[in-house]
Amino acid sequence: MTAKLIDGKAIAASLRQQIAKRVAERSQQGLRTPGLAVILVGSDPASQVYVSHKRKDCEEVGFISQAYDLPADTTQAALTDLIDRLNEDAAVDGVLLQLPLPAHLDASLLLERIRPDKDVDGFHPYNVGRLAQRIPLLRPCTPKGIMTLLESTGVDLYGLDAVVVGASNIVGRPMAMELLLAGCTVTVTHRFTRDLAGHVGRADLVVVAAGKPGLVKGEWIKPGAIVIDVGINRQEDGKLVGDVVYETALPRAGWITPVPGGVGPMTRACLLENTLYAAETLHD
């Protein structure tokens, strides 16, 4: 048995087409164009690539994209003032602060400064709390994208044993809440979990977001399980690999996401989806 691939690039492209269609319909109806403001502090190469992709995505679907590229020595006060201005700007539906930030800046305070109805990354405690209370509003983009990928398989998630490897605020913790909402029985683990192999081996569904290449071995995977690999790690030879050993997981899994081309494109597409949702549901 070889796993079926969950093609994140194709699913994300379809989602972008749907969003672009809706933006065009809004224009025909005389409604305003959704707007996304993206703040980049410093010149981290990976962040610059991510931000350029997000701006390109905005152009593709017809959003208005506002770019704020700030020097690495930007102060906390200056960033706070910018966020406050964007919070009050009626043309802006979403404010995205690209992480990581330079060490002298307090990311938590800045993320909390973004108004919850413009927090299209879904990182604000208000939005995380809504998800925890089973009344999600703006959902964290990567877990939201993963749920869309899982829906594409047609597999009924209700009652499945799900294991999340990684407990970050951005992926692991909100992912566990999304899976609970879908009716899974969820175990949250991390790279220091005792008998990680045992936990993974019992799972019908595994979501790995630990940021450690090759952490989850293919032979750990339960035959037929769904494997979602959030990891994206660049090797010395330049090749991108996930947190799962793909080659040995492929013959055991029922479904699997590739790296690259799996989760990453969906994270970006869900940022657009959240921005459209904010425009139509929270701001119109």
From Swiss-Prot:
Any one Gene Ontology cellular component term annotated for this protein: cytosol
Keyword Chaperone recorded: no
* InterPro entries per record: Aminoacid_DH-like_N_sf (IPR046346), NAD(P)-bd_dom_sf (IPR036291), THF_DH/CycHdrlase (IPR000672), THF_DH/CycHdrlase_cat_dom (IPR020630), THF_DH/CycHdrlase_NAD-bd_dom (IPR020631)
Which processes are annotated in GO (biological process)? L-histidine biosynthetic process; methionine biosynthetic process; purine nucleotide biosynthetic process; tetrahydrofolate interconversion
What residues does NADP(+) bind to?
Answer: 166-168, 232
Q: Which domain of life is it from?
A: Bacteria
- Give the Gene Ontology MF terms in alphabetical order: methenyltetrahydrofolate cyclohydrolase activity; methylenetetrahydrofolate dehydrogenase (NADP+) activity
**EC id:** 1.5.1.5, 3.5.4.9
Main role? Catalyzes the oxidation of 5,10-methylenetetrahydrofolate to 5,10-methenyltetrahydrofolate and then the hydrolysis of 5,10-methenyltetrahydrofolate to 10-formyltetrahydrofolate.
Q: Which family does it belong to?
A: Belongs to the tetrahydrofolate dehydrogenase/cyclohydrolase family.
Write down what this protein is called.
Bifunctional protein FolD 1
Q: Which organism is it from?
A: Pseudomonas syringae pv. syringae (strain B728a)
Print the organism lineage.
Bacteria, Pseudomonadati, Pseudomonadota, Gammaproteobacteria, Pseudomonadales
